[in-house]
Amino acid sequence: GLVGSEMCIRDSPYWDWERWEKEIDRMALYGVNMPLATVASEAIAERVWLRMGLNKEEIREFFTAPAHLPWHRMGNLNKWDGPLSDAWQQNQIALQHQILTRMRELGMQPIAPAFAGFVPEGFVQKHPDTQFRHMRWGGFDEEYNAYVLPPDSPFFEEIGKLFVEEWEKEFGENTYYLSDSFNEMELPIDKEDKEAKYKLLAEYGETIYKSIAAGNPDAVWVTQGWTFGYQHSFLS
């Protein structure tokens, strides 16, 4: 299939249905049949984190303002200019229903968001025995950077399963799910230790796939190619 949509279109979180309809029709015209469908990711995430024991305040402080959501969804940035309002979340759910209906009418296979391991700070504080990794990105202060679960944490599969289940409960069955754990971020290991690098990548890959399949055994994991170009010297 031909995948469409760029994760980092800065103004796309502000698109209304009229703008989205034009975009979807344009993608169809160019033969795109696997468009990204990440609208309302935060509304689904909020439901998951509530089920994992966080309160609304702990969850809301995790999200950025709308303009920065593409980077939040890739695990690069938290909190910046946030939070998101209840009205925003509700509107995004309604918009995503319209988007998915149109995509499916045109025979497209939407790529939905899946869990990549990034967790709110409130979750970190509730689980002091878990060895979270604190990532860095773009020169932002540490308070805005992501915490990521280790691949051997039992929470990973539990949370990943909930993400898929909550998404499909709201939007219907889906096949393709996007998850990227290290977009423009260094792996938390010695760069010279190739054995450790490949081992960690394999562990995250296996855990991400298992977490998606736990929610939908027929799901297909999709990942972006950008990371492999941006960090080619390290990942080669």
Regions found by a protein language model. Give the residues of each.
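Aromatic-lined carbohydrate-binding surfaces of glycoside hydrolases
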Residues: 5-6, 10-236
